[in-house]
Amino acid sequence: MILETKFEYFRRYFILARKFKTMDGNTAAAHVSYAFTEVAGIYPITPSSPMADYVDQWSAAGRKNIFGDTVKVVEMQSEAGAAGTVHGSLAAGAMTTTYTASQGLLLMIPNMYKIAGELLPCVFHVSARTVSAQALNIFGDHSDVYACRQTGFAMMCETNVQEVMDLGAVAHLASIEGRVPFLNFFDGFRTSHEIQKIAIWDYEDLKEMTNMEAVEEFRKHSLNPERPAMRGSHENDDIFFQHREACNKYYNALPAVV
């Protein structure tokens, strides 16, 4: 049996086997993220609201993810609450996602440190938007995502709708296998609301690419009375430093995973 070449693999998965649809960037992000999501912690904010809205609609319609389940959507009182929901849900062993932008993303930063520090795989999808200063501005820039650079989240950026579909999947797959959370972002309005004809992912193909052993390993580390474990402890500076340094091997390995 002749092994499939990389070109043949690319041609089979990326060109021949995929259907084409017309959609905007938010819809593309919602489509690909729904596949990997068991719980979505949401709170609407322009211009990312359509992502959460689509996920909510598909959940209500009974759409299944790659695990054969319908996504549980939890709308909180603010983005801070949504991020707390993501953290708690991940700690309980559920693949969890959220969608936000601008000041909403800034409210999530405290929980982002916790999620990254505990090596919990997840993806925050962000339609990057100006952080309001002397006035409100709902249009795109990267002032929100730049504020998150030292949280420990890896960052993936897209420049068009097709990239949102493809690299959005990469963010989820790499987070699962690499145990590092991702902030996946694209320009608010310029990409989030840009309409293009793109090749979409079939959920069966995404399931085939998912490292299910890594998913099961993630679930084994969840909070469970059958497997007692300590979380949220207090550490002095010497031990705290050692534990922070212990994360480095996952970040060093991540480029190869991506």
How would you name each of these model-derived features?
Residues 138-188, 212-215:
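Conserved thiamine diphosphate
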Residues 67-71, 182-258:
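Conformationally flexible catalytic loops at phosphate/diphosphate-handling active centers
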Residues 104-111, 134-140, 158-164, 186-193, ...:
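Short flexible/disordered coil segments
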